[in-house]
Regions:
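Charge-rich amphipathic alpha-helical interaction elements
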Residues: 1-140
Length: 140
């Protein structure tokens, strides 16, 4: 019995690699977005702490106001960054799904080719068994 060889095996292996790269890219984008969201939560915690601490005199109030203003600016920048990262993550997810589908098509082709090969092998084996049984009857 000969071994199964898929004609498009190299293409299939490359599609597997592409799918893996797309998945890694998506996960990288997802992690970057999650880290930015964590920074936003930390920034919010910092703001709450500053507001709860309060200020005793006029100079301390001015410093507090400047710190809060800086936190607001950082928050706006982070929100813009998060929005951009969300769009990149969605684009990377769509690309990953597309690469996964491309690989799936070749996987189905490989499975069908394997089934056809097995069918041919079984027919050859059955023909050999039939021939053997005919030879056995002739000698008996």
């Amino acid at each position: 019995m000969s071994s199964f060889a898929f004609r498009l095996q190299k293409v299939f292996e490359y599609r597997e690699l592409e799918e893996g790269w797309a998945k890694d890219n998506f996960l990288t984008k997802h992690i970057a977005r999650m880290e930015a969201e964590n920074e936003l939560f930390d920034l919010d915690d910092n703001r709450k702490f500053l507001l709860s601490a309060g200020a005793d005199d006029l100079q301390a109030r001015r410093e507090l106001e400047l710190r809060i203003q800086k936190l607001d600016d950082n928050e706006r920048a982070l929100r813009l960054l998060i929005h951009q990262l969300e769009m990149e993550e969605e684009q990377a997810r769509d690309e990953w799904i597309l690469k996964k589908q491309d690989k799936g098509v070749l996987e189905k082709l490989r499975d069908k080719a394997y089934d056809a090969w097995m069918y041919r092998q079984n027919k050859l084996e059955q023909a050999a068994l039939d021939e053997w049984s005919i030879q056995q009857r002739k000698t008996a």
